[in-house]
Amino acid sequence: MKKATAIILACLFVLVMAAACGGTENEVTPATQPSPTPAASTSTPAPATETEDEPEDDFDTDRVIAVFTREDGSGTRDAFVNITGVGDEMYIEAVVQNGTSQILTGVETNETAIGYVSVGSLSDSVKALAIDGVLPSDATIINGSYSLQRPFLVVVTDEKKEDELVQDFLDFMLSSEGQEQLGSTWTSPISNPAAYAPSGLSGTLKVGGSTSVEPLMQRMREAYIALNPDVEIEISGGGSGTGINEATSGMLDIGMSSRELRDTEKEALTDISIALDGVAVIVNVANPLTEMTLETVKNIFTGETTRWNQIG
């Protein structure tokens, strides 16, 4: 019995030792783990200093200047060529347009363009340049520091002035009520305009001519008819030359002109200034230029300067 018990204990001892040895052989010594690599930053690197600056202007100054001008007979053209000294030497390649709106559209849609329009017709679609350092404004037109300016005139024959309705409308345009229509767009040539009393007249007036004066005349018309509802006023364009010629012939009761009458025209017509207006030199809004000398304006419109990079 004792011998059997000893044998059993010996066997158990062997089994325990075998298990212990097997566990030691199968145990894996953990390998030294490498230090974790820091995760790459997901934030966007700060841009280089030069990328924070505004982009350089990409306006190509090597391009040819596209010159836009008004037609012969336009009061705006006459005032412009006389004041700048362009005279009869308008650039042969200049694109001739027959109205203010056409000039505005031409300059708005062509980055290389330059043109001129009435200050009262300016819009945000184009950029007006300072001339010799002076921008067109009510103040600079009144004090004369802005050189490109001219009067807005209505012209009538002596015969038409005798017409009661014609005279009443003329009186209205020169009155305080009429001059209020200039707003901040045009400058009044009258220091102390008189008040206007509605006449109660009726009838139809035909007024036509300068497309520069036309926007102001539309305002005058609306204000006058509000006070005299039995009056109709028909307004047409065509340019200052048309207004002068048709007023002379009697086709119009009142002509509109944005240039002074010539001596031969004064024989048949009386001119009356209803406002002062500047002529703005305009470029495309993409053009980096903000000012120009009057001499440079002349050189461009005579064709002496043909590229933007020739302007100092």
Which role does the model predict for each range below?
Residues 4, 22-312:
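Exported/periplasmic ABC-transporter solute-binding proteins
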Residues 11-15:
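Alpha-helical transmembrane segments
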Residues 16-20:
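C-terminal motif of bacterial Sec signal peptides marking the signal peptidase cleavage site
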Residues 1-9:
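Positively charged n-region of N-terminal signal peptides that target proteins for export
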